[in-house]
Swiss-Prot record:
InterPro entries: Aminoacid_DH-like_N_sf, NAD(P)-bd_dom_sf, THF_DH/CycHdrlase, THF_DH/CycHdrlase_cat_dom, THF_DH/CycHdrlase_CS, THF_DH/CycHdrlase_NAD-bd_dom. Its EC number is 1.5.1.5, 3.5.4.9. This is Bifunctional protein FolD 1. GO terms for molecular function: methenyltetrahydrofolate cyclohydrolase activity; methylenetetrahydrofolate dehydrogenase (NADP+) activity. Belongs to the tetrahydrofolate dehydrogenase/cyclohydrolase family. Homodimer. It comes from the Bacteria. NADP(+) binds at G164, R165, S166, S189, I230. Pathway: One-carbon metabolism; tetrahydrofolate interconversion. Catalyzes the oxidation of 5,10-methylenetetrahydrofolate to 5,10-methenyltetrahydrofolate and then the hydrolysis of 5,10-methenyltetrahydrofolate to 10-formyltetrahydrofolate. The gene is folD1. It comes from Rubrobacter xylanophilus (strain DSM 9941 / JCM 11954 / NBRC 16129 / PRD-1). PANTHER family: C-1-TETRAHYDROFOLATE SYNTHASE, CYTOPLASMIC, C-1-TETRAHYDROFOLATE SYNTHASE, CYTOPLASMIC-RELATED.
Length: 284
């Protein structure tokens, strides 16, 4: 039976480290503040933002919400992004996605100062990651790496397969795995013989956004399996992209859903906010 990689406990370690770092900066008079841009009233987005702001309060990070109606003009959001870029009191900020239908996210993300891009989702941040320049890393991919590293899972020289090629998770995670000297294959909806490819993986990360798509037939005996997916089941519970019970019988280690990658994503947003504050102190 697979060992469960407990994202909650590892995230708690990171939160404690962030809280200590925030206290240290505050003692030196350095502000640590996260601003959030929210357009519209999508229930999931409102909940996510509320959770993130509560996380900030728990580690001593000040947070401010900039909320707009769904019909907010694009130019008004762009003006706010430019203002936050130039505000020395703001350590970092992010735009809660998805945005309402009338708003194009790309110009807004492109306008974010990379040193304040705590989500790590702007084209500039993606480019810096791709060429190996220092940058704030996307929260979910970085959370996966930290969870593996802090759980004692070595990556150097191992064969890693990522299922999913999104800009949010799959692509940046593949780059981070390469940084760890893993040998990386990326699978997607056009991959032929998906199970044949994934069975080669010593470390298998599933981030396809399809409930229960990976089962025992996709998993090598003794592999480490990371389930990034999260879906609301008919009974109200949460499930992932991996059929957990059958995969647990073959894998050496497995992230649960919930309690695996999700807590790590939230913790890495706090980590990035602290890093952004440190960077601003160095530049001052």
């Amino acid at each position: 039976m697979a060992r469960l990689l407990d994202g909650r406990s590892v995230a708690a370690q990171i939160r404690a480290e962030v809280a200590e770092g925030v206290s240290e900066l505050k003692r030196r008079g350095v502000p640590v503040r996260l601003d959030v841009i929210l357009a519209g009233e999508d229930p999931a987005s409102v909940t996510y933002v509320s959770n993130k702001r509560r996380d900030c309060a728990e580690v001593g990070i000040e947070s401010r919400l900039h909320a707009f109606p769904a019909d907010v003009p694009q130019k008004e959001l762009l003006a706010l992004v430019e203002r936050l870029n130039g505000d020395p009191e703001v350590s970092g900020f992010f735009i809660q996605l998805p945005l309402p239908g009338g708003v194009d996210p790309l110009p807004l993300l492109s306008a974010i100062d990379p040193s304040k891009d705590v989500d790590g989702l702007s084209p500039q941040s993606a480019g810096r990651l791709a060429v190996g320049l220092p940058s704030l890393l996307p929260c979910t991919p970085h959370g996966v790496i930290q969870l593996l590293r802090r759980s004692g899972v070595g990556l150097e020289g191992r064969e890693a397969v990522v299922v999913g090629r999104s800009n949010l998770v799959g692509k940046p995670l593949a780059l981070l795995l390469l940084r760890e000297n893993a040998t990386v294959t990326v699978c997607h909806s056009r991959t032929r013989d998906l199970a044949g490819v994934t069975r080669r993986a010593e470390v298998l990360v599933v981030a396809a956004g399809r409930r229960g798509m990976v089962g025992a037939e996709h998993v090598r005996e003794g592999a480490v399996v990371v389930d990034v997916g999260i879906h609301r089941a008919e009974d109200g519970g949460l499930t992932g992209d991996v059929r957990q019970e059958e995969v647990a019988a073959r894998a050496a280690a497995l992230t649960p859903v919930p309690g695996g990658v999700g807590p790590m994503t939230r913790a890495m947003l706090l980590y990035n906010t602290l890093e952004a504050a440190r960077l601003r102190e160095e530049r001052a």
